[in-house]
């Protein structure tokens, strides 16, 4: 569902794009099974996303955001350019748009309101920008930017993550290696601690060349 969201939003942010087609929104049961649909094989909701949630990013009117990245340090500023794709029956007059940043517990860190906006029919309609210093986020946090048009069901949101720029680390008395070698054995035998980090750092045995046969 998240992949569909980003693909569809990318399309809606593209100027002069003629449209898009989604193929196979349900699970495919033939010639083996492909459990990859937003809906199950009976075209019923899977339980992890609802039709109401899908219409936030796939519908006649969709608020959009251009966000350079989704992971930040708290010495940075979150920036987003807000626009909208609107293909309803008429332009939206005197629209009141709210921008909110909150955490997963509902605490609001940022809120801004734009009043009396006229939203014409079309794509890439610019609404404004969001700039928020992340200095007040002192511990790792999952935040959410939501853009809503008051008095309508038109809304969309995006998650992003913030981490401290400086982290105090305590190495402790730990022997770190990528190979279970003699020193690791000696450290364990003497009651010490060993951390083996083998992921993509294996040095022992790299001299063996593998070939296809």
Where are these regions (language model features)?
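A glycine-rich, often tryptophan-bearing local segment used as a flexible ligand/cofactor-contacting loop or short
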Residues: 180-213
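Structural recognition of the beta-strand scaffold that forms the well-ordered cores
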Residues: 19-24, 176, 194-197
């Amino acid at each position: 569902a998240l992949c569909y969201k980003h693909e569809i939003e990318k399309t809606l942010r593209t100027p002069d794009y003629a449209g898009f087609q989604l193929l196979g929104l349900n699970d495919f049961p033939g010639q083996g099974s492909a459990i990859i649909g937003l809906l199950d094989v009976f075209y019923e909701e899977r339980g992890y996303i609802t039709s109401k949630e899908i219409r936030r990013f796939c519908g006649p009117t969709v608020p959009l955001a251009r966000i350079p990245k989704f992971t930040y340090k708290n010495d940075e500023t979150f920036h987003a350019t807000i626009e909208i794709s609107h293909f309803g029956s008429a332009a939206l007059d005197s629209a009141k748009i709210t921008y909110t940043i909150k955490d997963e517990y509902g605490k609001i860190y940022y809120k801004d309101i734009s009043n009396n906006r006229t939203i014409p029919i079309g794509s890439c309609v610019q609404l404004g920008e969001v700039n928020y210093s992340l200095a007040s986020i002192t511990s790792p946090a999952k935040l959410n930017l939501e853009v809503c048009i008051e008095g309508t069901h038109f809304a969309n949101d995006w998650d992003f993550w913030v981490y401290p720029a400086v982290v105090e680390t305590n190495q402790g008395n730990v022997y770190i290696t990528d190979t279970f070698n003699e020193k690791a054995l000696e450290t364990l035998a003497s009651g010490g601690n060993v951390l083996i980090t083998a992921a993509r750092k294996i040095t022992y045995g790299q001299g063996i060349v593998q070939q296809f046969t």
